[in-house]
Amino acid sequence: MIKKEEVYKIGLFNKPHGIHGELQFTFTDDIFDRVDCDYLICLLDGIFVPFFIEEYRFRSDSTALVKLEGIDTAERARMFTNVEVYFPVKHAEEAEDGELSWNFFVGFRMEDVRHGELGEVVEVDTATVNTLFVVEQEDGEELLVPAQEEFIVEINQEKKLITVELPEGLLNLEDLEED
């Protein structure tokens, strides 16, 4: 059985395309194209299920048409509408270019060297020019932290921990400090 910590979300299947079972795929990470891994993992009814990729072709920088093995009709493809798509962490770590997308870090905890625990990275916001980690604090409040290498001190993949050193004044961190 595939566990949540063994995968990370890379996108979403939208609606079927055509009559032969192709799916429109909106992705935030093109790792499936950069790494030798012939399957994607879908979250179906709370269970991570692998599906082999028969073929795919890009439509833009963030969309592709994907054909999965055994999904040969529009009717079968419809079952995948709005299904979240994940990629195995072990294969992402093998990327030849050494580049991991920011989305790889969703689920990691984040701490600041001066202020300690910030929270958990729950999302990556790419809606603006500056990519942001959306970090959920213990109290449920969200922090927006710039996803910039210059602020990252260390990434511990085993502990799923990102240590950052954020410039003073970047965030309102007074609320995080324990008195």
From Swiss-Prot:
This is Ribosome maturation factor RimM. Keywords: Chaperone, Cytoplasm, Ribosome biogenesis, rRNA processing. An accessory protein needed during the final step in the assembly of 30S ribosomal subunit, possibly for assembly of the head region. Essential for efficient processing of 16S rRNA. May be needed both before and after RbfA during the maturation of 16S rRNA. It has affinity for free ribosomal 30S subunits but not for 70S ribosomes. GO terms for molecular function: ribosome binding. Coiled coil: none annotated. The PRC barrel domain binds ribosomal protein uS19. Gene3D superfamilies: PRC-barrel domain, RimM. One of its GO terms (cellular component) is ribosome. One of its GO terms (biological process) is maturation of SSU-rRNA. It is found in: Cytoplasm. Residues 97-170 form the PRC barrel domain. Belongs to the RimM family. The gene is rimM. Its main location: cytoplasm. Binds ribosomal protein uS19.
